[in-house]
Amino acid sequence: MKVTPGFKASDLPLARTLTLGGMKVHALEAGIQWLDGGAMFGVVPRPLWEKKIPPDSRHRIPLALRCLLVEAPNALVLVDTGIGNKESEKFKDIYGVDNAGDPTRLEEAIRSLGFHTGDVDLVVSTHLHFDHAGGNLVLREDGTLAPSFPRARFVVQKGELGFAGSPNERVRASYMAKNYAPLVEADLVDVVEGPTELVEGVRLLPTPGHTPFHQSVILESQGEKAIFLADLCPTSAHLPL
């Protein structure tokens, strides 16, 4: 799909399905955000990256808020939750957030597959930046926060949770306590440390870089294997560059 400066979330399908051995894996498109292209590509010269992803008038490029829904043999596992519905209109303008309102686009994607938020058993955060963990909690009409997935346990690396609570100045704006602290207080978080076999067919592997305790998700079924890299590789354009 060609990415243009006018690219919208509605240009993406709600969900795409891959069969991995005997397991179904669904890529959920929870929306898009627009971030500074130079910041995303770092030392790569602009003349190179803008050929891959043209920026808008504010020098931003669109990034998919992509989550993963895994039909593991013994659990329904959601990996990352996008931005959610808690942010202000000012925030949405700054970051170019396009993820629908109520229900969020993530919830629509889950419903499109015949599931509901209450069917999710485990929610894995690859890391706790707002664009990956913002949908962990939902803002209700009365102004209170509630878990977006009422039956789920939330899984995060111990180091990531600690770092989120005391980040350095460079990344402070990316971490928001409202996206995870209420879950910790409600004892809904399962902290893991290092490589972890989550459930049959789903393993967690620390892949530090984007954050010190970022983790990727390895899926295996009937001899086939896939890995969800999350922000270890922000876009496909990063690979040839």
Task: List where the protein language model places each region.
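Active-site metal-binding loops of divalent metal-dependent hydrolases
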Residues: 30-31, 81-84, 128, 159-160, ...
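A short, conserved alpha-helix within the catalytic core of class I
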Residues: 135-141
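Metallo-beta-lactamase
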Residues: 1-115, 119-131, 141, 223-230, ...
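Short acidic/glycine-rich loop or secondary-structure boundary segments that cap or lie
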Residues: 36, 163-166, 198-201, 212-215, ...
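Metal-dependent phosphodiesterase/nuclease catalytic metal-binding core
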Residues: 69, 203-205, 215-240
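Short acidic, glycine/proline-rich loop/turn micro-motifs
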Residues: 88-93, 167, 239-241
